[in-house]
């Protein structure tokens, strides 16, 4: 399985004010101006360049939660529901630049590609997965498409909401063949408290 990493903790509500839409050429200019730096210097440089390029204080504040190396480019929010979907862009990643985060619940930020939140044990017990693993011994789990259309929340029968997210099974590497598709459901209670993640389906590519 590929190991997927999550964000640092935070306690601030994410609102539309935290969204940043760089103007034409702005992002390329910001990236180029900080590209020779690393670590904290890179983060500080990128956050400062965001502010100079017109990003709001909330947008810069969100970037600083990720040590200045990510920003929100869209927020799917229903005021009637506690949990929103933040579309987060990582400009310095080589791959998987776009990510989805479930925000404003408890915990406040959940990276849907963070392995700690995924029902990996249930996936590995699934007969279809075990059969696929016999065919592809180097099978790894990767994020699915994290595009501009985020997952739509569905009300749970006992209250709260569910977000169903798609993933890909690959024959080892990021550029290797997709050999299966997985869906996990993230469940929250009425207050936005994260309950658990469930395996919804595992489908091999035929």
Regions found by a protein language model. Give the residues of each.
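Extended, low-hydrophobicity segments enriched in charged/polar residues
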Residues: 14-145
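Short acidic-glycine loop/turn motifs at beta-strand connectors
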Residues: 189-191
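Short, surface-exposed coil-to-beta transition loops
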Residues: 94-98, 149, 177-184
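Secreted/processed peptides and extracellular or luminal domains of membrane proteins
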Residues: 40-41, 50-52, 155, 179-183
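Bacterial N-terminal signal peptides
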Residues: 1-4
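Short, solvent-exposed aromatic-acidic interface loops
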Residues: 169-170, 197-206
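Acidic, glycine-rich flexible loop segments
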Residues: 129-179
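Boundary at the C-terminal end of the N-terminal hydrophobic targeting segment
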Residues: 9-11
């Amino acid at each position: 399985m590929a190991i997927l990493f999550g964000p640092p903790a935070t306690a601030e509500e994410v609102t539309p004010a935290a969204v940043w839409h760089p103007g034409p050429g702005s992002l390329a200019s910001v990236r180029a101006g900080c590209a020779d730096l690393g670590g904290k210097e890179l983060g500080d440089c990128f956050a400062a360049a965001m502010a100079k390029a017109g990003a709001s204080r909330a947008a810069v504040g969100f970037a600083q939660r990720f040590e200045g190396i990510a920003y929100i480019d869209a927020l799917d929010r229903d005021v009637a529901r506690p949990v929103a979907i933040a579309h987060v862009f990582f400009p310095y990643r080589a791959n998987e630049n776009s990510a989805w985060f479930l925000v404003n619940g408890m915990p406040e930020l959940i990276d849907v590609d963070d392995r700690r939140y995924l029902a990996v044990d249930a996936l590995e017990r699934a007969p279809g997965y075990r059969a696929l693993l016999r065919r592809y011994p180097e099978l790894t789990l990767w994020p699915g498409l994290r595009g501009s259309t985020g997952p739509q929340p569905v009300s749970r029968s006992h209250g709260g909401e569910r977000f169903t997210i798609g993933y890909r099974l690959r024959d080892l590497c990021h550029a290797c063949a997709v050999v299966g598709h997985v869906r996990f459901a993230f469940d929250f209670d009425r207050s936005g408290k994260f309950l658990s993640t469930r395996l919804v389906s595992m489908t091999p590519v035929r």
